[in-house]
Curated annotation (Swiss-Prot):
Entry keyword set: Cadmium resistance, Cell outer membrane, Cobalt, Membrane, Plasmid, Signal, Transmembrane, Transmembrane beta strand, Transport, Zinc
Stated name of the protein: Cobalt-zinc-cadmium resistance protein CzcC
Gene: czcC
Subcellular location(s) per record: Cell outer membrane
Induction of its expression: By zinc, cadmium and cobalt (zinc being the best and cobalt being the worst inducer).
Position of the signal peptide: 1-22
Length: 418
């Protein structure tokens, strides 16, 4: 009896958790460290580098990809054997003891189906990571140029406020000299107050844009002095036909396709579970009363009479059909958004060029002429205010069109994963 159960006891001891290989604990609590950009000028390359190294959405997607390796590792594992003991009769002289090992054997391709599903999950995580990386890059570029535009708006509002202040002073002098009505001075003061409000709003918008940019690498308090970049270099992208061809390699399309593949792989997993597994039993039986040992050999297989995994298989098939529809719908949506962004980019570029080459120079000439004419007494102050307002609106519109241009370009890059 002792000889029979000694190997069993040793096996149980070695298989206990105390003898298991210790796994490293990566879930320790730690305080996140948020990087800060340099206090000097900030370039687009520096902003992209900071976001790539410190954005938590990006690191979370990378860890999700890393976790799928564990799923593949587990999918490759075969089922554990089972040790079983049985004692018949508690009297020592007539006791019968049995020790056996039950070895499950998977049938129906369950292991290969599991591995295939786990690998498809890894591909989905890879495509998701690429999509997140492209999205973060597009966000950084869009936010960076938003800061550039906000900086220009502050400069514009500052200049407009200075012009309005000088105009109010000039109007005051002309009123004192009796050359214009005090009503014109009041209008000049109102225009000066409006210009100061525009400057305050532009300053607040710049601060919000700066915070939105640095938040992409976890810094809530911007440290950089200013963003350095060239707004005059308008972005350009290939023709819509070429963009549609690039869409095939987009991470967003790849992620949708990978989800479809994963769902189809899960159908294979559920289909493999329709086949019952075989259990082979090997062991020894000790009959103390007869003083003899006997071999124990057995085979067990479930009869799939009622449960054939039909419900889970049906659900998996419908989920795969759903993934197919979502993939097609996603492609249609991405194509539509891509073409809309391409059209918006073309229109915005044309508008920006027209404003820069025609509207802005004309508005500046009209304002300069009105100012000189007012100082010479040829125009009234209403003409100056009207010219100043036209120039300011033209510049604001130009900055708005620039923002639309860069937004359309970054939308294209986000869709294509550039």
């Amino acid at each position: 009896m002792r000889r029979l159960f000694l190997p069993l006891g040793l096996a149980v001891a070695f298989l206990s958790p105390n003898f298991a290989v210790a796994q490293s604990d990566t879930g320790t609590s730690m305080v996140p460290v948020f990087p800060r950009e340099a206090a000097g000028p900030l370039t687009l390359e520096a902003a992209l580098s900071l976001a790539a190294g410190s954005n938590f959405n990006l690191s979370a997607a990378a860890k999700e990809l890393d976790s799928t390796e564990g799923g593949i590792m587990q999918a490759r594992v075969i089922p554990n054997p089972e040790l079983k003991t049985l004692v018949e009769d508690t009297r020592k002289s007539t006791r019968t003891s049995t020790a056996q090992m039950n070895i499950p054997i998977e049938l129906g391709g369950k292991r290969s189906a599991r591995i295939n599903a786990a690998e498809r999950t890894r591909e989905l995580a890879q495509a998701t990571l690429a999509g997140v990386r492209g999205d973060i890059r597009a966000q950084v570029i869009e936010s960076f140029f938003s800061v550039l535009i906000a900086q220009e708006r502050v400069k514009l509002a500052t200049g407009s406020a200075d012009i309005a202040a000088r105009g109010a002073q000039a109007a005051s002098r002309r009123v004192a000299a009796g050359k214009i009505s005090p009503v014109d001075e009041t209008k000049a003061r109102v225009e000066q107050a409006n210009a100061e409000l525009e400057l305050a709003e532009a300053t607040a918008s710049l601060q919000s844009a700066r915070q939105a940019l640095t938040a992409l690498w976890g810094n809530a308090s911007p440290q950089f002095a200013e963003a350095q970049g060239n707004l005059d270099a308008l972005p350009s992208r290939p023709a819509p036909e070429l963009l549609q061809k690039e869409l095939e390699n987009s991470p967003l399309v790849a992620a949708s396709r990978a989800e479809l593949d994963r769902r189809q792989a899960l159908v294979g997993v559920e289909r493999s579970r329709q086949y019952p597994d075989l259990t082979v039993s090997l062991g020894a039986k000790r009959d103390t009363e007869a003083n003899r040992n006997m071999a124990v050999i057995g085979v067990a297989i479930p009869l799939p009479i009622f449960d054939r995994n039909q419900g889970n298989l049906y659900s998996a098939i419908r989920q795969a059909d759903k993934a197919q529809d979502e993939y097609l719908a996603n492609r249609i949506s991405l194509t539509r958004n891509l073409l809309m962004a391409s059209n918006q980019l073309s229109v915005s570029r044309a508008s920006a060029q027209t404003l820069k080459q025609t509207v802005l120079p004309g508005a500046e000439q009209a304002f300069n002429a009105a100012t000189i004419g007012f100082e010479a007494g040829k125009f009234n102050y209403l003409d100056v205010l009207d010219a100043q307002r036209t120039l300011f609106q033209a510049r604001i519109r130009y900055l708005g069109v620039l923002g639309q241009t860069y937004q359309a370009a970054t939308t294209i890059d986000r869709i294509l994963g550039r």
